[in-house]
From Swiss-Prot:
GO cellular component: membrane
Presence of the UniProt keyword Transmembrane helix in the record: yes
Keyword hit for Transmembrane helix: yes
Native organism: Glycine max
Induction remark: By fungal elicitor.
Protein name: Trans-cinnamate 4-monooxygenase
EC number: 1.14.14.91
Positions of (E)-cinnamate binding: 213-218, 307
CDD domains: CYP73
Subcellular compartments: Membrane
Major localisation: membrane
Keywords on record: Heme, Iron, Membrane, Metal-binding, Monooxygenase, Oxidoreductase, Transmembrane, Transmembrane helix
């Protein structure tokens, strides 16, 4: 770092310290703030808790400070909520007050400062984007239109694994093939397109760019520059990479998918009012009507690439891992499928309603291994009240949904993978947020609308894999490693596991 930058930074630190002390004193008199560790000027609690604000570390802090606590991260207030009652306040009762989204330097780049739907602030733009995205993506009509495609993609996975000579002996990293399946599931909906194989050059570019985007956005390593603006110059190189990745991704979306669809113009299906057009046709209609611009179109595609593909893939991978490590549960699920559907009848989307144990396996996977354990952060635009405390305007609000679903005060032996709980003591709990102890998709205005797609895709995929294979750990291992890797608000398996898949004979 050159001396001029160092000098400016030191001067900035001194001035910020003076301002921070003054502001902290004034605000302390004005507000009754939630409890939390004592902050220091400039850095707040950052030096105490560090960058790694994952769900388990925040759970440890909740055990110390209570169901609501405040972390002062540099110049930002971070409020963490860890009880069903307070989660209900944030997500439902005061859903408008806490319905906005926080900004950070990296997500500002990847979303064009909130031109998307998922990360934009609460208001008219969000309502418009939600409406435009709901019809082509998140309705029962979409499920019925595309469920045959999901079933055929799952069937293709089964056939490819059967053809792999290593899969039944030394094992295969099945995630790679499932990733292609998930891209095809969503690109069918978005563009009426699919990729024939993992070797498809466009698929490889998409996968690489989306992976890099996920790594950059989910990393904790940029937090210091986001929390403490005067340290932001040190992020210059990191943010430059983010901008390059964003621009390359959006150009790929535009050149190979959006513009290609525009060239096709009206097709036979789009002229038939009784048939649902693919999603991009609906979105381009909104652009032609002047409701959104081209950037909004591309950021909708960006949201689906991130929020729909990867999160569902993480959950499928977790489900497979738990079934491998619990062979008795895997066999119980297989027995249910054989008994209800009969030998050779492959699981379809309508069949899921006849398979309660399969539904319970999906729900238990989402409980124990929640893909978005802290949900997407919320924010209050104005000063608010929560749990008897004052919450200053523009505070970042995290709901520790993983702890809500894994707190032994609310769940019987929550550390166990036990689908039976959803037949026994938790028989009334559903994934749609009907119980604030269990919020895998959130609830309320900013809940994840992708629940309507994720649940059937999870059911079809896990059902067909268990139906067609005995899933085992690789030779020499009694179990597969289920160590976690947490991100800004993600939870996925640390190591993509090798799975032995022995075909069954019917």
């Amino acid at each position: 770092m050159d001396l001029l930058l160092l000098e400016k930074t030191l001067i900035g630190l001194f001035l910020a310290a003076v301002v921070a002390i003054a502001v902290s004193t004034l605000r302390g008199r004005k507000f009754k703030l939630p409890p939390g560790p004592l902050p220091v000027p400039i850095f707040g609690n950052w030096l105490q808790v560090g960058d790694d604000l994952n769900h388990r570390n925040l759970t440890d802090l909740a055990k110390k400070f209570g169901d609501i606590f405040l972390l002062r991260m540099g110049q930002r207030n971070l409020v963490v909520v860890s009880s069903p009652e307070l989660a209900k306040e944030v997500l439902h009762t005061q859903g408008v007050e806490f319905g906005s989204r926080t900004r950070n330097v990296v997500f500002d780049i990847f979303t064009g400062k909130g031109q998307d739907m998922v990360f934009t602030v609460y208001g008219e733009h969000w309502r418009k984007m939600r409406r435009i995205m709901t019809v082509p993506f998140f309705t029962n009509k979409v499920v019925q239109q595309y469920r045959h495609g999901w079933e055929s993609e799952a069937a293709a996975v089964v056939e490819d694994v059967k053809k792999n000579p290593d899969a039944a002996v030394s094992g295969t990293v099945i995630r790679r093939r499932l990733q292609l399946m998930m891209y095809n599931n969503m690109y069918r909906i978005m563009f009426d397109r699919r990729f024939e194989s993992e070797e498809d050059p466009i698929f490889q570019r998409l996968r690489a760019l989306n992976g890099e985007r996920s790594r950059l956005a989910q990393s904790f390593e940029y937090n210091y520059g986001d929390f403490i603006p005067i340290l932001r110059p040190f992020l210059k190189g990191y943010l430059k990479i983010c901008k390059e990745v964003k621009e390359t991704r959006l150009k790929l979306f535009k050149d190979y998918f959006v513009d290609e669809r525009k060239k096709l113009g009206s097709t036979k299906s789009t002229n038939n009012n009784n048939e649902l057009k693919c999603a991009i046709d609906h979105i381009l209609d909104a652009q032609r009507k002047g409701e959104i611009n081209e950037d909004n179109v591309l950021y909708i595609v960006e949201n689906i690439n991130v929020a729909a593909i990867e999160t569902t893939l993480w959950s499928i991978e977790w489900g497979i891992a738990e079934l491998v490590n619990h062979p008795e549960i895997q066999q119980k699920l297989r027995d249910e499928i054989d008994r209800v559907l009969g030998a050779g009848h492959q699981v379809t989307e309508p069949d899921i309603q006849k398979l309660p144990y399969l539904q319970a396996v999906v729900k238990e996977t989402l409980r124990l291994r929640m893909a978005i354990p802290l949900l997407v952060p919320h924010m209050n635009l104005h000063d608010a009240k929560l749990g008897g405390y004052d919450i200053p305007a523009e505070s970042k609000i995290l709901v520790n949904a993983w702890w809500l679903a894994n707190n032994p005060a609310h769940w019987k032996k929550p550390e166990e993978f036990r689908p039976e709980r959803f037949f026994e003591e938790e028989s009334l709990v559903e994934a749609n947020g009907n119980d604030f102890r269990y919020l895998p998709f959130g609830v309320g205005r900013r809940s994840c609308p992708g629940i309507i797609l994720a649940l059937p895709i999870l059911g079809i995929t896990l059902g067909r894999l268990v139906q067609n294979f005995e899933l085992l750990p690789p030779p020499g291992q009694s179990q597969i490693d289920t160590s976690e890797k947490g991100g800004q608000f993600s939870l996925h398996i640390l190591k993509h596991s090798t799975i032995v898949a022995k075909p069954r004979s019917f």
